[in-house]
């Protein structure tokens, strides 16, 4: 049942187990043991236990999952983790809390449980700053770890168009809550958000403005200097404005639609704010001419270059995929080893 839930839980692996059903908890722990046996020798410093995105149960005995079935599962799982990794620190992730219920009930339940002394082994709580306000406005009885969305933002497939620098957003998310945070976990799904990772790490360590970090990045990774450096820096900053887009198929404008079901036709990727696309293209293309062959072929530069070229070509071609854009997409697939990836991470190279 989904009593009180506004969305179905994600179930894309179809292996969800309800811990409230007979034998369910035992089976979950059995599977976790198999995983822990494989990674025991890795000796990680931290293990993070998350309620979502895969997993969870919304039956009446488990709901609300994040503060009921999930917490009960954590309490059973932590002793098993300790058998294999006695010194590891345990973090509890609150990612997607409230997404499926539309309320703060899961945050409230975790707050109450920790206040009562449950989950004493939990060292940190992990909270997403884009969408979750509750943990940053209440005493959660544990220090918070920052979990900014640096990957799955503004475009689908994320990373499918090259680099996705988000300097303004990254700095905003840090500045809003920096006094409430003990550190961060800028999780990513590939190398394309590399600039965002570096921005966040420098904010965590040195409180350094994003623009200064990008300038350092361009000097260190590509050896840029002088006027070229400043023009490329401006282009990278502007890529945040030109990132947001939707893809469109015949009769469809829905980035969450299964592409394999749409059939043949025009492949369109409509950039919401294209005004600076050609200036970005020129700055990156001009800089590319002055780079050494080694730097020009580096993965980090290629992802910046391809993003600039793809966006400009799309605008020239009324946002439709032509042969040139298709070739750029194929280069991203090769560079990032996405041949067997899914639709949310693989550029649209299908017919």
What kind of feature is each model-predicted range?
Residues 1-224, 319-350:
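Catalytic-core regions of glycoside hydrolase
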Residues 175-181, 191-193, 205-351:
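Catalytic domains of carbohydrate-active enzymes that cleave complex glycans
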């Amino acid at each position: 049942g989904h009593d009180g839930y506004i969305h179905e839980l994600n179930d894309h692996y179809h292996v969800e187990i309800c811990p409230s059903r007979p034998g369910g908890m035992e089976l979950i722990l059995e599977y976790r043991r198999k995983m822990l046996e494989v990674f025991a020798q890795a000796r990680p410093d931290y293990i993070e236990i998350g309620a979502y995105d895969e997993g969870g149960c919304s039956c009446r005995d488990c709901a609300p999952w994040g503060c009921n079935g999930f917490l009960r599962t954590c309490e059973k799982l932590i002793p098993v983790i300790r058998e294999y990794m006695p010194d590891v620190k345990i973090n509890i992730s609150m990612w997607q809390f409230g997404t499926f219920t539309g309320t703060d009930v899961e945050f409230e339940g975790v707050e109450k449980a920790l206040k009562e002394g449950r989950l004493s082994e939990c060292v940190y709580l992990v909270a997403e700053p884009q969408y979750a306000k509750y943990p940053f406005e209440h005493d959660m009885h544990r220090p918070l770890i920052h979990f900014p969305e640096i990957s799955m933002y503004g475009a689908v497939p994320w990373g499918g168009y090259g680099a996705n620098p988000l300097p303004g957003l990254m700095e905003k998310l840090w500045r809003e809550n920096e006094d409430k945070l003990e550190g961060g976990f800028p999780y990513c799904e590939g190398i394309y958000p590399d600039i965002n990772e570096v921005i966040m790490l420098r904010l965590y360590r040195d409180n350094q403005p994003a623009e200064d970090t990008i300038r350092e990045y361009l000097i260190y990774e590509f050896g840029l200097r002088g006027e070229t450096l400043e023009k490329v820096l401006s282009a990278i900053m502007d890529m945040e404005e030109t990132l947001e887009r939707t893809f469109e198929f015949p009769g469809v404008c829905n980035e969450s639609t299964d592409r394999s079901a749409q059939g043949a036709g025009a492949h369109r990727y409509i950039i919401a704010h294209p005004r600076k696309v050609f200036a970005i293209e020129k700055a990156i293309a001009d800089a590319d001419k002055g780079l050494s062959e080694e730097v020009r072929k580096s993965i980090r530069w290629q992802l910046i270059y391809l993003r600039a070229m793809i966006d400009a070509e799309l605008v020239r071609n009324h946002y439709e995929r032509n042969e040139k854009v298709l070739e750029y997409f194929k280069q991203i697939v090769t560079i990032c080893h996405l041949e067997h990836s899914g639709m949310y991470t693989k550029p649209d190279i299908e017919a």
